[in-house]
């Protein structure tokens, strides 16, 4: 894959870069695996904003993606690779030998016609899913479960992957892309390979409107607000805020650690790398 840089025929097109995607299917998605989505625009059941900067955007159907890979030892053939507006990775429509079709997160290197399978002792081949205890140390994987049978939770975004670095007893040790080292049960399933669309981080939307198409609204700086709206607000003329960066509710931000889950602290061997 390669990046396409738009010709600057207008101000909005001047900085646009996108990923060339000839291998993606150009038709409609598989209708039986679609669901309607209702937008909450960041509001809760009382109508209050609980997540800022959300609203609007293009209507989208949700693609039902199989994160559990629970059709054991039934071979499947990849019919096509598709774009999914709900995630950064591409998805693959696979046809199982028993006639069922499912969407899965497409790994890099998977193409139409490829054969994949999920099973206890599946081959170490891109797209195959099997428990971590049966995967060789050093293998690069994605779509890793956090609990056996719960479905993939780690490394699902475009271009992400996890390396299996050790197996000891009932636990496997994983090295995340962030640098974090953590243990998960060796019975958790993972898929071989890294996630597709690894050039996604090089894409430039080019204009504010492209964010609006995605349902993302503008982010106003705290120093541009009034004191009633933000701790950084107010002041005569332009100010720096006068204090260390905080959220609108006074909680320190920009590097402030908010993790509070003592139950799983023991599973983290090394915290993620910080700048």
Swiss-Prot record:
Keywords: Ribonucleoprotein, Ribosomal protein, RNA-binding, rRNA-binding. Residues 39-49 have a biased composition (Polar residues). One of its GO terms (biological process) is cytoplasmic translation. Residues 35-55, 223-260 are annotated as: Disordered. The keyword Iron does not apply. InterPro entries: NA-bd_OB-fold, Rib_uL2_dom2, Ribosomal_uL2, Ribosomal_uL2_bac/org-type, Ribosomal_uL2_C, Ribosomal_uL2_CS, Ribosomal_uL2_dom3, Ribosomal_uL2_RNA-bd_dom. One of its GO terms (cellular component) is large ribosomal subunit. PANTHER family: LARGE RIBOSOMAL SUBUNIT PROTEIN UL2M, RIBOSOMAL PROTEIN L2. Belongs to the universal ribosomal protein uL2 family. Part of the 50S ribosomal subunit. Forms a bridge to the 30S subunit in the 70S ribosome. This is Large ribosomal subunit protein uL2.
